Amino acid sequence: MTDPRILVLIPARMAATRLPGKPLADIAGLPMIVHVLRRAEAAGIGRVAVATDTPEIAAVVAAHGGEAVMTRTTHPSGSDRIHEAMQKLDPEGKAEIVINLQGDFPTITPQTIREVLPPFADPAVDIVTLASQIHTEEEDLAPSVVKAVGSPIGPRRLRALYFTRATAPYGNGPRYHHIGLYAYRRAALERFVSLPPSPLELQESLEQLRAVEAGMRIDIMIVDSVPRGVDTPPDLETARSILSKS
């Protein structure tokens, strides 16, 4: 039985710059958004819904037995979209934790989604996200790979200090590839979307730095691997290859 205090929201829109229409791209016989929806449902942690500004996406989700909520087309980020969806789906405020699961993670595992929950046992934690250790120089140097920099507070847990597209931290020791899945306390999400974009957020083009600069606590759980995101046509072909074998 899922927990009514947890809401899993999947933002999805058709107007992606590098791969327009990607939520409905076919992967092994199903639209990509349906793969993500089913993995979120399999996690079994809370109510799951797709937040979209596109009636076609909402119709596909409904046709596959999922829940969709229509949101405005003008949102600057996925966080703003899930905030509107949260208000529509849960006006009574029963949901205490809101998870923002990217709609372009068709290979993410249910267990990976569950990993964001344990840190909320500490009431000081505002936001939880994920990262995986970097093992290749290519990953280490790529600006497209966001690095999570944090102080260890457990064997697989960091307290976030910074996020950057640069290679960081300097020197010997592990570096971590940030995974763009976020879980917010409801009050933290409310605060986050009320804040203006911050200087470092604009410089790095990383919205999580808005929370860091505002003094919000972000904990990072370390997972074994990075789920394959789909941003380009080659990414889509890779996802098709992986899921056609599963």
From Swiss-Prot:
Family recorded in the similarity comment: Belongs to the KdsB family.
Write down the SUPFAM superfamilies for this protein, in alphabetical order. Nucleotide-diphospho-sugar transferases
The enzyme class is transferase
Classification of source organism: Bacteria, Pseudomonadati, Pseudomonadota, Alphaproteobacteria, Hyphomicrobiales
Q: Which Gene3D superfamilies match?
A: Spore Coat Polysaccharide Biosynthesis Protein SpsA, Chain A
Kindly list the places in or outside the cell where this protein is found, as annotated in its UniProt entry: Cytoplasm
Q: Where are the transmembrane segments?
A: none
- Has the keyword Transferase been applied to this entry? yes
Keyword annotations: Cytoplasm, Lipopolysaccharide biosynthesis, Nucleotidyltransferase, Transferase
* Known EC number: 2.7.7.38
Instruction: List the molecular function annotations (GO) for this entry.
Output: 3-deoxy-manno-octulosonate cytidylyltransferase activity
Query: What catalytic activity does the UniProt entry give for this protein?
Result: 3-deoxy-alpha-D-manno-oct-2-ulosonate + CTP = CMP-3-deoxy-beta-D-manno-octulosonate + diphosphate
Its function?
Answer: Activates KDO (a required 8-carbon sugar) for incorporation into bacterial lipopolysaccharide in Gram-negative bacteria.
Q: What is its main location?
A: cytoplasm
Record has Kinase as a keyword: no
Q: Which gene is this protein's source? A: kdsB
Q: Name one GO cellular component term.
A: cytosol
- Pathway listed for it? Nucleotide-sugar biosynthesis; CMP-3-deoxy-D-manno-octulosonate biosynthesis; CMP-3-deoxy-D-manno-octulosonate from 3-deoxy-D-manno-octulosonate and CTP: step 1/1; Bacterial outer membrane biogenesis; lipopolysaccharide biosynthesis
InterPro entries annotated for this entry? Cytidylyl_trans (IPR003329), KdsB (IPR004528), Nucleotide-diphossugar_trans (IPR029044)
Q: Which GO terms describe its biological process?
A: CMP-keto-3-deoxy-D-manno-octulosonic acid biosynthetic process; lipopolysaccharide biosynthetic process
**Family matches, as Pfam families:** CTP_transf_3
Q: What is this protein called?
A: 3-deoxy-manno-octulosonate cytidylyltransferase
